[in-house]
Amino acid sequence: GAMEVQTARTGGISVVDDLQAPSHGQLEQPRLDFSVRVSGQLAAHIDATCQALWQKLQARAGRKSQSLALRGIQSKSDTLRGLGRKPKQAALVLRDNLSQRRSIERSYLRAIARAKQEVLVANAYFFPSRKLLAALCHAAGRGVQVQLLLQGRYEYFLQAHASRAFYARLLQAGVAIYEYEASFLHAKVAVIDADGRSPWATVGSSNLDPLSLLLAREANVVSRQREFAQELQNRLQAALAQGRQVQAADLAQRPWHERLFDRLAYALARSMVWLVKDHF
């Protein structure tokens, strides 16, 4: 019979060596990234998702005589056995170009809307939708401490400059922005109200950018386990300490050509989003 899967992992960790950057060579410190190991039925659910996708790709490649349709595998609440002794609720949240185009974005929006104390997001590639941007600003406006840990090293033109086009509005709304400079940031994680009544945390493959939210196949694990949320929060706070906080004065003092690049990158990214939305 088929082997029963005991554990599974999901996260943002790349197959590339964490001490190597394709465009920068050897790194002094490894990339900052996260993955989560799950067990039980949630691991089996992840396995079923991978098996179904593998069958679909085999069929598409013509390796089977009949086409195998990928069954819609929905997000499922289950248990995540990790840092705490007792199993707690967790879910696998998927994004594809079929029935689950907005699932990860909706998960973030619901959690941010319910935030009472703190929202802490670490994202390598940050170009939020208008709804996500508004949700972050509204949360800060109602007194929630909103902190973003973003890429502090120059990696790609579009990513580096398009993200900074959002800084002024976020800072004006009261959002704290930190740029991680110890190494390259590759994390796609968030923690909300880790010490509150309804903790929420996610670790996965999805950035808050158009590629992840509109095009790519992504998978995040969402957990409401307090111990898990607090441990992730502690690790992110340590990473914030290695970052540089961006001040409004910093934006005004940037060279004119850098600000021009921000506007150009933003306009290019927005046009790409428009094309993608029109296509899908």
Which residues fall in each region the model found?
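Charged, low-complexity intrinsically disordered terminal segments
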Residues: 1-280
